[in-house]
């Protein structure tokens, strides 16, 4: 039974991402999770502009300046008997593409909700994405050290707006200045809250049982009585936790706490490691691949440039689907049809990188990329598979980009193509002129591109408005028809960063007319990598 150690390693893995609306406290939760995983000694809370103490997971220049997480970091740490891979996703509303792709690489998600605000727009969008793969969701109601909405109302809102059943695991006692702690329904115990302990793991003060007189003495008779009454209601009206429904993405366990006060995060982590699935099978075009298969397979879901300003490098983030990575192993780079020798893959602790000696199904490793790896690429040890479902979206916003110094056109193009390969932005080169058009899903992406062109490629660029409303990738099985379409639509055609033919429409009316005139041509709003 030589593969017992391998199976044990795979079953320990828990790979998840955090989804939330901007400012719901995601970066703070990431910090505290790392603190409990003993990955960092003290939590540096994210401060406003220019503060010197930055959250461990926000490490690019612009993120440090603005206090928002723009790129997906990967952090690995042990917790209980598991090895947890946490993928930190951009919380800012603009970064849906990067976030979306990250959600294709995880087996479960932690949804963080600001308990003062409830379900917000961004959370809805991200939940739609997790629905596509029925990803199991754990919920953390955050910011109980502030005044919050009624907890029952919050559960109702999650159920009705996100269409998922809620099973409360803990229940808050008071909130804001009156916040006293939580009652853990499964353990039948009250965990008391102490203020001012946000940077370290505090000793827990626990009161066993709901009818314990110590509870009244500690939190006050009124709050204790309120807790008992609320629990009677909650237990009568809400769902019990059901593992099977959770794994199907139909029910979410709900925890209450405050990430800033470092309270309740461990209960949520306990739930996540106990209940969330070990690495799941993944669908390839040819067949489903099980995590426990001994042959290595993996796919690239993100490329990031210049993680190390000292080295002009790019790292391709790969989710291992099955098997084991060992240093120096040979694998097939399926799209290019060639064997590669991977000797220097890295593992992550947000911006700190260490060489991976071995990594297993469920883990994320980084491959050094010198321009040959693209998002969606599959690597295998033998079988020629292609993992599916890593999409590119047609951008919704467009601008022309121009140089302050015209002599740097070559660097500009190189920078833009690299940034587009990494998914930071999309680039379109019209066939009829030398313009460069940048397409994004959100406004902030434009700022990121200019900032990164300056700091990483030493290119000063500015934007101008451009008459483009939308873009569609063009496909047609009939070469003659495609040729006719290209001849008649020269002014609206461009090549994207990967040289795919794209139709750039000045208005939606124009796009609809083109579709009517050329019914044989497909105009696609998404394109799989």
Curated annotation (Swiss-Prot):
Keyword line: Cytoplasm, GTP-binding, Nucleotide-binding, Protein biosynthesis
Subcellular location, record wording: Cytoplasm
Ranges of residues in domain tr-type G: 11-280
Any GO CC annotation of this UniProt entry: cytosol
GO molecular function, one term: translation release factor activity, codon nonspecific
Residues engaged in binding GTP: 20-27, 88-92, 142-145
GO biological process, any: regulation of translational termination
Pfam families: EF-G_D2, GTP_EFTU, RF3_C
Classification via InterPro entries: EF-G-like_DII, EFG_III/V, G_TR_CS, P-loop_NTPase, PrfC, RF3_C, RF3_dom_3_sf, RF3_GTP-bd
Protein role: Increases the formation of ribosomal termination complexes and stimulates activities of RF-1 and RF-2. It binds guanine nucleotides and has strong preference for UGA stop codons. It may interact directly with the ribosome. The stimulation of RF-1 and RF-2 is significantly reduced by GTP and GDP, but not by GMP.
Family statement: Belongs to the TRAFAC class translation factor GTPase superfamily. Classic translation factor GTPase family. PrfC subfamily.
Name by which UniProt lists this protein: Peptide chain release factor 3
Gene from which this protein is expressed: prfC
């Amino acid at each position: 039974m030589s593969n017992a150690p391998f199976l044990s390693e795979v079953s320990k893995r828990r790979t998840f991402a955090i989804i939330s609306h901007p400012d719901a406290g995601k970066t703070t939760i990431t910090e505290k999770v790392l603190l409990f995983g003993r990955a960092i000694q003290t939590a540096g809370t994210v401060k406003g502009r220019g503060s010197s103490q930055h959250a461990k997971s926000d490490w690019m220049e612009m993120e440090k300046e603005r206090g928002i997480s723009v790129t997906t970091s990967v952090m690995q740490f042990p917790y209980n008997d598991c090895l947890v891979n946490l993928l930190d996703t951009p919380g800012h509303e603009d970064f849906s593409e990067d976030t979306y792709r990250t959600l294709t690489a995880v087996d479960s998600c932690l949804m963080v909700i600001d308990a003062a605000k409830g379900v917000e727009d961004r959370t809805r969008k991200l939940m739609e994405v997790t629905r596509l793969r029925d990803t199991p969701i754990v919920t953390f109601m955050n910011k109980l050290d502030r005044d919050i909405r009624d907890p029952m109302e919050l559960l109702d809102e999650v159920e009705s707006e996100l269409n998922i059943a809620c099973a409360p695991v803990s229940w808050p006692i008071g909130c804001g200045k009156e916040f006293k702690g939580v009652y853990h329904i499964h353990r039948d115990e009250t965990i008391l809250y102490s203020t001012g302990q946000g940077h370290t793991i505090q000793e827990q003060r626990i009161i066993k049982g709901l009818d314990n007189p110590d509870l009244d003495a500690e939190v006050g008779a009124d709050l204790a009585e309120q807790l008992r009454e609320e629990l009677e209601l909650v237990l009568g009206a809400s769902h019990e936790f059901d593992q099977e429904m959770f794994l199907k993405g139909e029910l979410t366990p709900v925890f209450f706490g405050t990430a800033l006060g470092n309270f309740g995060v461990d209960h949520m982590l306990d739930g996540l490691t106990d209940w969330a699935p070990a690495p799941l099978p993944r669908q390839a075009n040819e067949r489903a691949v099980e995590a426990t298969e001994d042959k290595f397979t993996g796919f690239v879901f993100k490329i990031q440039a210049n993680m190390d300003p000292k080295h002009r490098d790019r790292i391709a983030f790969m989710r291992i689907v099955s098997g084991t990575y060992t240093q120096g192993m040979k694998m097939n780079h399926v799209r290019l049809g060639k064997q590669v020798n991977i000797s220097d893959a890295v593992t992550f602790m947000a911006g700190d990188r260490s060489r991976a000696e071995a990594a297993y199904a469920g883990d994320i490793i980084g491959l050094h990329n010198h321009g040959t790896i693209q998002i969606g690429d599959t690597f295998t040890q033998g079988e020629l598979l292609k993992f599916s479902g890593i999409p590119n979206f047609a951008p919704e916003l467009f601008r022309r980009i121009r140089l302050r110094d015209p002599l740097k056109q070559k660097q500009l193009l190189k920078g833009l193509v690299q940034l587009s390969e990494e998914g930071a932005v999309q680039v379109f080169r019209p066939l009829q002129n030398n313009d460069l058009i940048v397409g994004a899903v959100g406004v902030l992406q434009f700022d990121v591109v200019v900032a990164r062109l300056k700091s990483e490629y030493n290119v000063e660029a500015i934007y101008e408005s451009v008459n483009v409303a939308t873009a569609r990738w063009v496909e047609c099985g009939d070469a003659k028809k495609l040729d006719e379409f290209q001849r008649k639509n020269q002014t609206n055609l461009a090549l994207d960063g990967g040289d795919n033919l794209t139709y750039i429409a000045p208005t939606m009316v124009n796009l609809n007319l083109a579709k009517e005139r050329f019914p044989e041509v497909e105009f696609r709003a998404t394109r799989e990598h």
